[in-house]
Amino acid sequence: MIYRHNETVSAKALSDLREAVGWNRMESEYENPLMTSYYHIAVYAKDELVGYIDCVSNGVTDAYIQDLMIHPDYQGKGVGTELMNQMIKYLKEKRIYMISVVFEENLKPFYDKFGFYPMLCGQMETFNSK
């Protein structure tokens, strides 16, 4: 496995991985130059993107882990754990002290391992349909 930090990942490779994990492709969104992250890590097996994590941040206090995707063939093999460990290490080195993540309930035990806990404040969201 090769872990690449903050190197360009093609929109097609990201979209293929999203599709493999059951998410929508978003290829045109990834091609938009405004679609950037504060930091990301990509994992490759040979030349195939098999894992990806990214976060958005103000670069000072807060970071939000936006996506953690592991190709189904590589799930349960420690790839997601390693990506989380590397991301958290990087953010701590940058002295970013509040890291948040939104996840499906069945993934709670995974995120518990990294010290995540429910926030005591309300969280709300809205979606602007096109």
Residue ranges of predicted features:
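Short amphipathic alpha-helix that is part of the acyltransferase structural core
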Residues: M1-S28, G122
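A conserved beta-strand-loop-helix scaffold within acyl/acetyltransferase catalytic domains
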Residues: E29-H40, Y44-K46, G51-M69
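Residue-level recognition of the GNAT/N-acetyltransferase active site
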Residues: H71, E104
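Conserved acetyl-CoA pyrophosphate-binding loop and the N-cap/start of the following alpha-helix
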Residues: Y74, G78-Q86
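Conserved GNAT acetyl-CoA-binding A-motif
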Residues: L91-F103
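Conserved catalytic-core motifs of GNAT/GCN5-like acyltransferases
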Residues: V102, D112, Y117-K130
